[in-house]
């Protein structure tokens, strides 16, 4: 007996109209729902399920030429787990939608990569260096060309640039870090950041300090760039000396903070090292919390790091969904830029001491 759309909707616990739109790749349907319906259809041997192209023809991204570019970033930065995860999310979603995808790494914004068919692109998904206004100030020729195209930035839009963006709610990241530390009884907190002008980290710092004030705890910022500063192509903070200097300043403070919020997991890994060099143990002598949930960077850390997951892969998928909705308009452009936020969630480890428990034990 032939399987009907109504049967698929019943198994997926969805309305028939939602199941139909999911099978046809409608951009208003979430990727999770779309994948659920596709899986149910495949298991029930729904006729036509083998033809993904036919099912996706209603998707505004079907057959479109979309470029995914990293701008002004060193390969060591684009290889960081959060960045790579976001790009993978974009790739997966574009492929699922039936788009033609072209990837390009553009560290030098004064050069337009050979073979990049700018005149044949329908849209661009961009990941840019978020340090100050370095990208916008470069005034590279590629920026002028990309600005002509429908644009969605992944994870964040560099200061002074154009286009829509799907970002992590970095202000909330900072606020949640402060709230968690306060709940654990910490009353003097430190924010450690070797990239003071980094847009993500500035937002996290603002959220951290604001929440600390609201909660009645004190928070101090320890932010300083390495002597050579930052330039394009931007690299991650690899100089251990800079983080060591910042951690030493935290340790020398009187009174001394009991907890550090590292601006990102890559920085937290260096904070662990800096504390170890001084003979201190994370979770006992100093508590540490961070953000991104970069498992490839933090899996080996002991004790396991408490961090805020920014859901980079989902941000990439949502960016593609937004591009599809943008292309549904006649021009693919808007009179105003739009920024969509993905909310963070806490991933609890053992790196934060519960001072309330210790106080009651005494």
Regions found by a protein language model. Give the residues of each.
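Alpha-helical recognition/docking segments in bacterial nutrient-uptake
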Residues: 60-179, 252-255, 266-269
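Flexible loop/turn connectors
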Residues: 244-362
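Short acidic capping loops at alpha-helix termini that bridge into adjacent secondary structure
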Residues: 188, 219-222, 281-288
